[in-house]
A protein has these predicted regions:
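N-terminal segments that mediate ammonia production and transfer
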Residues: 1-215
């Protein structure tokens, strides 16, 4: 190996997770794009890792454009009529499995949103299929819920709404980390945006499609 030169040092070298990107250049929406993206993910299994359990991965997921029509139908089942695309946000929230802790975290989230002038429309339990998940991954599996938040009427710039959501995400996380016992916290906001949503977990790349029936 060549010796160090200038500011370079071999210790700076590091590997990274695999990333794929799928888009329709004409802006046409289709579930096929999601299926194609999951296929890309599955073809990057070599970029992930697993331990002695072949069915417990070190993490994999997918970010997609907010599926407005799908979320609209799902929220109707909960008695909620979502606004038009861009006038609400969808978030993926990991809550603790233990009911008491989950409700404590939810209460803090609700109060934080109210303090920031944001209206929570509803929470939706994310359906999952755990049949192919290893015991180690199952032991740390969170309770996954999606939260839907209305954009305040006085906010017309979508970037302003996105900044407000960023503040909510960080403010809530800080409050929960400072008020709930740290050895009991299982709270994490995987994504919170009007534009995109993330589906992820301690999975292998091949498990994402089956684990999340939404996809």
């Amino acid at each position: 190996m060549a010796g160090n030169q200038g500011l370079y040092h071999p210790s700076f070298e590091h590997d990274a997770c695999g990333i794929g990107f799928v888009a329709n250049i004409k802006g046409h929406k289709s579930h096929q794009h999601i299926s194609d993206a999951l296929t890309v993910l599955e073809n990057m299994e070599h970029r992930g890792a697993c331990g002695c359990e072949q069915n417990t991965g070190d993490g994999a997921g997918i970010m997609i454009q907010t599926p407005h029509e799908f979320f609209f139908d799902e929220c109707l089942k909960l008695g909620v009529h979502l606004p038009s695309f861009g006038r609400y946000a969808a978030g993926m929230v990991f809550f603790p499995k233990e009911i008491r802790l989950r409700e404590e975290c939810r209460d803090i989230f609700n109060r934080s949103a109210e303090k920031l002038g944001l209206e929570i429309l509803c929470f939706r339990k994310v359906p999952v299929n755990t049949s192919g998940i290893g015991p180690t991954a199952l032991s740390v599996e969170p309770e996954m819920e999606q939260v839907f938040i209305a954009c305040p009427d006085h906010i017309n710039n979508p970037d302003d709404f996105e900044r407000k959501l960023f503040i909510l995400r960080n403010y809530t996380t800080h409050l929960i980390n400072s008020t709930v016992r740290k050895d009991e916290i299982g709270f994490y906001i995987a994504s919170l945006s009007y534009k995109t949503i993330v589906y992820k977990g301690q999975l292998t790349s091949h498990q994402v499609r089956e684990y999340f029936p939404d996809l």
